[in-house]
């Protein structure tokens, strides 16, 4: 059984499965999800134990597994990425968020993290998902560090988004979280 859930030229949208352990809405995840959605891609989110997350990956069959991780979550994220890879899943794992941005060498040094996204992730993630969907390479996408053939490709940072570029982003995809009872009455 091929446990790398890649669309590779099938002409359908790509899927990203966000994995998180904190029951709070992450604004960066919601803005990236909205941008992906507006370009025909799909995002889902998974909470739970390592076993529940692995089961969720099998159920959703994503093209990319993504974490937005604060340093306080780093130990948990390492354990979950190891459990995912140990289960035989080969889908690329992307680690973004403040930990990857502030401590990129630490983030990419974990052997079960395939890609880290530094700084703003909206357009790097869109480019990555488009590349995964089309079967194109993604080793030159700015803001991404990629583990490939045992080496790390450290792409340069792209310029930060300007105020007009930030204003042009779609509204946050709050529906990503609202399917969970915990968030249905969330006041924001």
Which stretches of residues belong to each language-model region?
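Short, Lys/Arg-enriched N-terminal segments with co-localized hydrophobic residues
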Residues: 1-12
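Glycine-rich beta-alpha loop elements in corrinoid/cobalamin-binding modules
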Residues: 15, 21-22, 32-35, 39-163
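Generic start-of-chain signal for non-secretory N-termini
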Residues: 11-18, 28
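Radical SAM [4Fe-4S] cluster-binding motif and immediate context
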Residues: 6, 164-167, 171-188
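Glycine- and acidic-residue-enriched helix-capping/strand-helix junction motifs
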Residues: 23-27
